[in-house]
Amino acid sequence: GPKEFGNISFDVGDNPDTVRKNREEIQQRLGFNAWAELKQVHGEVFIPEAVPTSLDAPGVIKADGHATDVPGLALLIKTADCQPILLAHESGKHVAALHVGWRGNRLEFPISGVQAFCQHYGFSPQEVFAVRGPSLGPARAEFVNAAAEWPAPFLKWYNPETRTMDLWGLTKAQLQQAGLLAERIFGINTCT
């Protein structure tokens, strides 16, 4: 079927056996010992110590970000058009993963997620690298009621002519506001 290749979500109506097989294949190819999966809810809850979950079932902890310092524990974030943001301390010993949709941007989750990550492990945001993965690009993030959906300070990222929001630019600004250095923020500018 159309969802068979590489699908790792139990939540989209795919055959559960196919999903399990895809999850096992990813584990084998990437070589991690275990992974931690969340039940993503488009919010701002951050789990500072990720909880390993089974490859055989969906995540149940309702949150949109988690972190770990456990070697071999992979952090799973699932996205379609939302932004996956991976954070890593410069030592390589601490990592975090955030799921940021437009609601997460509006909640300023890139800021609070970085703050929670740094506070929990006791380091400065200036010591952190960030990579934003493929997501809905600036030319495609359409909002027909932007004034109703976004508070005024966010509208500088909105183009009224195209009715689109530059979520990539907004996220970079939020990561910088959280204290990350601009030269440590990267983006994979592939629009989903």
What is each model feature region?
Residues 1-192:
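Active-site microenvironment for binding and transforming phosphate-containing groups
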